[in-house]
Regions:
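Residue-level signal for well-ordered alpha-helical segments
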Residues: 28, 40, 55-58, 62, ...
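Mature-region segments of soluble proteins
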Residues: 46, 61-170
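C-terminal segment of N-terminal export signals and the immediately downstream linker at the start
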Residues: 3-7, 12, 16-55
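Short, exposed beta-strand "edge-strand" segments with a Pro/Gly-rich flavor and a Y/T-containing core
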Residues: 1-2, 33-35, 93-100
């Protein structure tokens, strides 16, 4: 069977439109349903409050949308790490990690050593906290549509207008 150019172009156009719809789903910043429970989301919001004190009002929606786009392996790692951190929190403070204050959460993360280790997905609890929780929350918050503008670095050096905005010459 021979395919004509027209049939090939129609097939290519159909495949591209399906691929484009899939890419649109992956980049949907408004998705709010996610695989985490309320306790899990509270844990991630506590991490957000610790590592990014100027977290925006839409932090919960942004983090939920980010977690909803993760693959199953990453979500399992995130949930397992949150569960272990939660049990550690209950042992030290008698409350879940999501219920801790910012100061208590900081102390707990420092106690397990999350502020002194490299991130590894399969390492110690501190390395996994750094990889699955801290890095994921920072990535979600800093790559949202508003980006880094709330931090005063909206146009980094190397991008058009970057040097002028970086040096305050605008």
């Amino acid at each position: 069977m021979k395919i004509t150019r027209r049939q090939a172009l129609l097939g290519l156009a159909g495949a591209s439109s399906v691929g484009g719809l899939g890419a649109h789903e992956l980049l949907d910043w408004t998705a709010t349903d996610g695989p985490l429970s309320d306790a899990g989301m509270n844990g991630l919001l506590t991490v957000a409050d610790i590592v990014h004190p100027a977290a925006p009002e839409d932090a919960e929606r942004t983090i939920s949308a980010y977690v909803g786009r993760l693959n199953d392996r990453r979500v399992r790692g995130l949930v397992t790490t949150l569960s272990e951190l939660d049990s550690r929190s209950r042992r030290h403070y008698g409350a879940s990690f999501g219920a801790l204050s910012r100061a208590q959460g900081e102390r707990l993360l420092a106690r397990i050593g999350a502020n002194r280790v490299q991130s590894r997905p399969e390492g110690t609890l501190a390395e996994r906290v750094r990889y699955h929780l801290v890095n994921s929350v920072l990535y979600a918050l800093l790559t949202r549509p508003a980006g880094t503008e709330p931090l005063g670095i909206g146009n980094p050096v190397g991008f058009p207008g970057g040097f002028a905005s970086y040096t305050g010459e605008l």
